[in-house]
């Protein structure tokens, strides 16, 4: 976040969002940006051709079979997908659905890497608190229940096991106590700025 002043006048606290680019992923994975391919997966009718092969394999293939599932794993980074999906579910990201994500892979000369999933927008994290909590099945939320890619993967027992295990890790590790331990020191840092912003825009 940052505090914005215009000609000395306080304009409030603003959140700075990161833009996912080839440079971003090149710094993380190593190599040059020219070797990184990035796509924005936005609408079912606009599946990028580069991603279409994997998408069709998962949504139209016999994913319950070992052979098909192994072909899928050759094209996707399973750990990345599990973290992406389980985190969005656990944090209740209300802007989350399968067509609001960024995918990237290394695709340099003579090399085609696995697809990785990346958060595109988490500014409304915990925004589902009124419709998705301990008493509501998050899986029934439209962005998840209508996801053909996830449905295809869930036909495979190995994926089911991996998905349950990763979600269990989130539940066991990201507890209320650990969250409070991390967030409480930040509260005092942001309290004044948040209060001033709310007062400026009449949000109190």
Language model features: what each stretch is:
Residues 2-5, 10, 14, 42-204:
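Middle-to-C-terminal accessory/interaction subdomains
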Residues 6-7, 11-45:
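Conserved structural core of kinase catalytic domains
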């Amino acid at each position: 976040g940052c505090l914005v002043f215009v000609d000395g006048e306080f304009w409030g606290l603003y959140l700075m969002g990161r833009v996912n680019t080839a440079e971003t992923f090149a710094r993380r994975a190593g190599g040059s940006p020219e070797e990184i391919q990035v796509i924005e997966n936005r609408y079912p009718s606009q599946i990028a051709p580069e991603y279409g092969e994997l998408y069709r394999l998962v949504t139209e293939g016999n994913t319950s079979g070992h052979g098909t599932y192994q072909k899928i794993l050759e094209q996707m980074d399973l750990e990345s997908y599990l973290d992406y999906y389980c985190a969005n579910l656990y944090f209740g990201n209300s802007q989350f659905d399968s067509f609001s994500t960024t995918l990237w892979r290394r695709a340099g000369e003579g090399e085609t890497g696995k697809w990785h999933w990346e958060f595109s927008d988490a500014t409304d994290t915990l925004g589902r608190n009124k419709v998705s909590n301990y008493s509501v099945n998050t899986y029934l939320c439209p962005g998840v229940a209508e996801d053909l890619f996830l449905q295809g993967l869930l036909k495979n027992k190995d994926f089911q096991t991996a998905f349950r295990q990763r979600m269990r890790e989130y539940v066991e590790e990201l507890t209320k106590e650990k969250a409070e331990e991390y967030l409480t020191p930040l509260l005092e840092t942001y309290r004044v700025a948040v209060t001033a912003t709310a007062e400026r825009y009449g949000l109190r």
